[in-house]
Curated annotation (Swiss-Prot):
<dbReference type="GO" id="GO:0003984">
    <property type="term" value="F:acetolactate synthase activity"/>
</dbReference>
<feature type="binding site">
    <location>
        <position position="493"/>
    </location>
    <ligand>
        <name>Mg(2+)</name>
    </ligand>
</feature>
<dbReference type="GO" id="GO:0005948">
    <property type="term" value="C:acetolactate synthase complex"/>
</dbReference>
<keyword id="KW-0786">Thiamine pyrophosphate</keyword>
<dbReference type="InterPro" id="IPR023757">
    <property type="entry name" value="THcHDO_hydrolase_firmi"/>
</dbReference>
<dbReference type="GO" id="GO:0019310">
    <property type="term" value="P:inositol catabolic process"/>
</dbReference>
<dbReference type="Pfam" id="PF02776">
    <property type="entry name" value="TPP_enzyme_N"/>
</dbReference>
<dbReference type="Pfam" id="PF00205">
    <property type="entry name" value="TPP_enzyme_M"/>
</dbReference>
<keyword id="KW-0479">Metal-binding</keyword>
<dbReference type="GO" id="GO:0030976">
    <property type="term" value="F:thiamine pyrophosphate binding"/>
</dbReference>
<dbReference type="InterPro" id="IPR029035">
    <property type="entry name" value="DHS-like_NAD/FAD-binding_dom"/>
</dbReference>
<feature type="binding site">
    <location>
        <position position="65"/>
    </location>
    <ligand>
        <name>thiamine diphosphate</name>
    </ligand>
</feature>
<dbReference type="GO" id="GO:0009097">
    <property type="term" value="P:isoleucine biosynthetic process"/>
</dbReference>
<dbReference type="GO" id="GO:0009099">
    <property type="term" value="P:L-valine biosynthetic process"/>
</dbReference>
<feature type="binding site">
    <location>
        <position position="520"/>
    </location>
    <ligand>
        <name>Mg(2+)</name>
    </ligand>
</feature>
<keyword id="KW-0378">Hydrolase</keyword>
<dbReference type="GO" id="GO:0102481">
    <property type="term" value="F:3D-(3,5/4)-trihydroxycyclohexane-1,2-dione hydrolase activity"/>
</dbReference>
Amino acid sequence: METIKITTAQALIKFLNQQYVELDGQEYRFVQGIFTIFGHGNVLGIGQALEEDPGHLEVYQGHNEQGMAQSAIAFAKQSNRKQIYACTSSVGPGAANMVTAAATATANNIPVLLLPGDTFSTRQPDPVLQQVEQTYNLSITTNDAFKAVSKYWDRVNRPEQLMTAMINAMRVLTDPANTGAVTIALPQDVQGEIYDFPEYFFKKRVHRIERTPPSKQAIEDAVELIKRKKKPLIICGGGVRYSEAAESLKRFSEKFNIPFGETQAGKSAIEWSYGLNLGGIGVTGNSAANSIAKDADLIIGVGTRFTDFTTCSKFLFQNDDVEFLTINISSFHANKLDALKVISDAKVGLDTIANELERQGYSSDYEDEIKKAKNEWEKELNRLFNIEYTEKEFVPEIAGHCDKVVEEFYKEFDSCLTQTKVLGELNELLDDDAIVIGASGSLPGDLHKVWCPKRSNTYHMEYGYSCMGYEVSAALGVKLAEEDKEVYSLVGDGAYLMLHSELITSIKEGKKINILLFDNAGFGCINNLQMSNGMGSFATEFRHRNSETGKLDGKLLKIDFAKSAEGYGVKTYKVNTIDKLRYAIEDSKKQKISTLIDIKILPKTMTRGYESWWHVGVSEKSKNPKINKAYESKINHLAKARKY
């Protein structure tokens, strides 16, 4: 047996260079590169290996461990999970910073390989710098925190353990049904130790992503169920995008006259203008999708996890005869809502069912309901896109909470921009193939309803974990995947303040991204949530502490985000009118460096809900009668929702 005597870290890098995936006969390099933030836990091991021989791996210097890992996740998501970046950090706080990103990847079923440094396997210098000592178990380190949020976790305590660890890492990373974060903890002493690795460990490996076919019995059962139903509705989930099943879904929808609503992950698999596309569904959905869903007698979930936002906490589907059919590569997700399960690749499952349904001459009983629902929504969309602030008697979309804050904001920031008006303008101003990105706050809800993608895969929303701070980091990852397109991060002031470190990386690397920063001086989405459930405005607006009351009810906090970003070397714009917005967008397209457009947005001018409900933890008892009333409303809605 031929062997190669190299360090554990060198073997790791050599192995990563030999990983490929194959889908539909086309081969892709699986590990495109690695994001690094070096510390004592990885610089002399992985760092040395990368300096000496990185192979084809592109090495990027991150500026926050969570940020760089979120960039890696966005790259994999935009690449339909066919390529990934690895991420390496030091021990302790550097590793802990990646835990949030690991959860983001796992919640969304997106592959990311995390390689945190670890304490010494020998324990000779214990406690090493940044080590957490647990007196009841000395084998525990910070990296054990990854176990709860990883799809596969391992620690390489001896060089020879690297082989089985990495074989299993690739097994999970390339498994469409079970992918997510993979964490391989690497003790810093082991990284530098040499071992005679067998040559065959480094052979080229092609991981074939199989299009798992459905069973014959599952197809027969699915066809019989659909034939019994008159008004089915398809839910287009993220699996449609990752399976590249958009054309199959369109054919299925057309053949049988079945409309579909989109989840956040599924949106833009098919362009907005397609006649049977009802748009966003669920808590953040529009009136077209939600009204059809309410009366549907069969819900066909394709590649969806049926989250609470998709099902309105299982309240959305009100037809007494409604049943569920799932087409999903994951048996776990396919098993939800007592559904009839078709465990299959989305594309193959749709095509196989369609062939049999067509042979039996099936068609839904929809007449003009679909067209009417879409027309009504388009009227509402037009209204939303044309809402303008008038100083007198202006009623915001989210009315009755703290209407006076709108006037206060207008006077303080000299801006009359409403959020829906700005989104309407952006719909027209951005290039058709531009990619918009979001994750948290009120923007995902608004975008799910009102964004009208003109091209496929141009809507990139992380709403499985809805991680504040994903937005800017993700823009870099998306740009790495789609270098020829303009990339726009739509982010609120709250999320931007939490994390925007990889904006610096974009500048250093010459990877232009565009930040559209919606500043409404607070956590506006959560302010809406608390006030719509009876609370007052409490610690969700960005205000100075009032010296008289001792509370956070002083003047609004004014932040010049454009000035701050200018110091990074970003091209910036300040926007408080539609004309300035139009200029900023057009001028930003001419720039070669990253841009930030600081848009001052009137509070409470985001969209409201449409025939939706969300189950949240309202207090069962309060001195506030409004909260007691909100609790009663919750109980009434729960009575109409499925129990599981």
